[in-house]
Every structure is written in structure tokens, then in C-alpha cells.
Amino acid sequence: MRIFIAFEGSFEAFDVEAHTSVGAIKQMIKDYFHIPLSEDKQGRWYLELMYAGAALRNSWSLSDVGISFCSTLKCFVKKEDKPTLYVFNAVTQEMMPIMENMSLLDKKVSDLRMLVTLRCGFPVSVYCLRTPTGLEMYDCNTLKDYQTDIGTTLRLDVWDGWKEFLMGCLLGQKPKVQHYLSKEGPVLKYGS
């Protein structure tokens, strides 16, 4: 069957089978238009096919999504940026991607900690950042001082005694939080 591909002002016909996968069609488009797709440390370039306003997955076949004879698919070259750094939050067990430009690597650890605080909500004074080898990172040093490169995963560790309090806050456990905030000696020591 014949379908049409709209790409950067061109409108080209392609003869394909109904069971052809979207991934195979992307390869045909890449070869026909000589599109250089690449991947590096900062991101990757890829093709996206759209039909009726929806992005098509590589594994789908044309017949799966109702694409018939003389249908028109739109094709775009898109860039997917990779995070500059990742920060593993030891409290929540979540990985935080840090999507800043590369100049972040030349900045001080304190600048990164401010970004992390804005993302996770933890006060700067309750945690430290560690390198992949476990070395504590000090605010006055630059990220380059710790051989931090694009894609490095750092670890956020909280100081002793803060993990339980922060988890109580994150999970909405009011009695646990009140216990940690109490000024009354018996409640602080023996509360629930």
C-alpha cells in the first residue's frame, strides 16, 4: 500500500506492506532523506512519526493503528536531552535527574545543593552529597574537584536522626512528626 510522509516541507510517497512496523518505516525515512541521527553524552537525536496527532511506537505495525492506503504520516527529528547529573536520594530511594547545562560541572557544590533543595524540598542543613565512591562533597569545592562528569550519579545522605523525621513528613505521618518536634521531654523520649 502507498502512504505519504511529510518531512521538513517535503511530501514523499512510500510503498509499504500493511504489517510493516513503525520502526522499519523510520529506517526507510532515515535512508531516503539521509538523516544523521546520533547519540552523545548530552543527548540523542531520533525520528518521531505521528499519525492523527499521536506519536507512534517503533513496535507497532501500520495496521495496528488504523493506517490505511494513502494515509499521511508526519515525521520529525527530535532531540532528547540527557541529564547532566543524577542524584540518588537515600531517604526516598528515588533517582533525581538534574537537567542543567554543562556549566553546572564548573560550579561549586553549594550551587548544586541549592538545586537539589529546590527539587526535593529538604533543607540544605540536613543532608550532604557524596561521590559515587562515598566521598563527602564540601560546599566550597567545585564539582570538577571531585572528578564529576556528565551522567555521574551522586548520593544524597541525610545526617543521623533526620531520615525518620523526613520520611514521616513525606508520608504524612502526623504523630511521628509531632513526636520529633515535641519540646516536652516525656513525649520526645517516649511518645508513639
From Swiss-Prot:
InterPro entries xref list: ANKUB1 (IPR042788), Ubiquitin-like_domsf (IPR029071)
Protein name, as recorded: Protein ANKUB1
Organism per entry: Mus musculus (Mouse)
Protein origin, superkingdom: Eukaryota
Disulphide-bonded residues: none
Signal sequence residues: none
